[in-house]
Structures are given as structure tokens and as C-alpha cells.
């Protein structure tokens, strides 16, 4: 999901918490999530001031902010360099193992497959096989 262009990275994450009716400290949770994805120093930047990879990480922070039980992620590491992609993979793995979050994702990144419990290969819009 695209970021709201007239809101800072911080505001993009905090807005979702307001919409979800988050009962905790929204400021603290917003800052935690942005720091978790390595953007603590960029939280007051507008989306157009962020690289594609940084924007992707803001979207991930926004997705995890309200502590969902399930996350749908379409190519979550697509615009990230390999080191940042590994960082995102670690975050997802921790969410799965420590918080019991289910993550359903599409990806071409075979590295992400190592955290998967179930893998479906799709060819021409059809499930070709299951691992």
C-alpha cells in the first residue's frame, strides 16, 4: 500500500494506529516500529524525501504497528538492498516466532522461503506445486 504523500513517515504509521483505535501510547509505538525497521532518524521525512527502500520499510512499520495477527505482504523486499532485505526477514521471523503472527506473502526472493511453513509456486495464475 502506498504511503500518504502529504504525511511524514511518522504520521503515516501513527495514522494507522488512530484508525485501528490503538489504546496504548501511539507516539511510543510509532517510534518503536520505525526504529525496528531502521528509520528512527528518518521518521520526520516526507515520502518523496525517502528512497524506495525506505518507503517500503515505512509501509512495513505501518503494517506491524497495530500488532495484527495476520499480515499480507506483496513483495516485501522488492525495493530493498540485500542487507535491508535480511533485516526485514529477521523482523518477520521474530513476528512469527515470538508473537504468533501469520504472514502471507508473495515474493520472488528465495531467501524469504526459509522462514515459510508452506510454499505455493504459481505459474500462469495457477498453483503449480506446493512445498
Language-model features, listed with the residues they occupy:
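Short coil-to-helix segment of the ABC ATPase nucleotide-binding domain corresponding to the Q-loop/switch region
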Residues: 7-14
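Catalytic Walker B motif of ABC-type/P-loop ATPase nucleotide-binding domains
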Residues: 71-74
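Helix N-cap at the start of a conserved alpha-helix in ABC-type nucleotide-binding domains
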Residues: 82-84
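Conserved ABC ATPase signature
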Residues: 46-56
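ABC nucleotide-binding domain "signature" region
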Residues: 25-37
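Conserved catalytic motifs of ABC-family nucleotide-binding domains
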Residues: 67
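Hydrophobic anchor residue at the start of the ABC signature
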Residues: 60
